[in-house]
Design a protein with these regions (language model features):
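Conserved S-adenosyl-L-methionine
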Residues: 107
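Conserved SAM/SAH-binding loop
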Residues: 110
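Conserved SAM-binding motif I beta-strand of class I
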Residues: 125-130
């Protein structure tokens, strides 16, 4: 990640909440700094590519067209993603939450952000909602 994005106070959450636990087996990796996706990567078919994509500082599309598309290429509109780590930690740092604060997150997505917040403030203090059943 970019220098300074992951501040020392967020390092414990980053280490305790691995991104790969919140990334499905079928993904369309993004390109760092760009809103474009590479081709589909399936963990069981290309594990090295999947792991490299998960731990690269880039967004990952996890769903297309509200789940209606499941083909080998790309759908029309990306509808769920796991955000770029530098973006996630920049936003969390700007939020300024501390242990004991209560957080309502709208848009759970893959759940990684909520898990990072839960590590920081306590799981009992985080409520997250998602309209997408997938």
């Amino acid at each position: 990640m970019e220098k300074g994005t992951l501040t020392s106070d967020w390092l414990p959450a980053y280490e305790a909440v691995p991104r790969h636990l919140f990334v499905p087996g079928v993904i369309w990796p993004g390109r760092g700094g760009m809103n474009r996706q590479d081709e589909r990567v399936v963990r069981d078919e290309e594990p090295d590519m999947w792991w490299a994509a998960v731990y690269r500082d880039a967004p990952i599309t996890t769903q297309w067209d509200d789940g209606a598309y499941a083909g080998a290429g790309k759908g029309k509109v990306p509808s769920s993603s796991n955000s770029m780590p530098t973006m996630v930690f920049s936003m969390l740092d700007a939020l300024g939450v501390e242990k004991g604060h209560r957080v309502l997150e709208i848009g759970t997505g893959t759940g990684w952000n909520a898990a990072l917040l839960s590590h920081r403030v306590g799981a009992e203090n985080v409520v997250t909602v998602e309209v997408d059943e997938a």
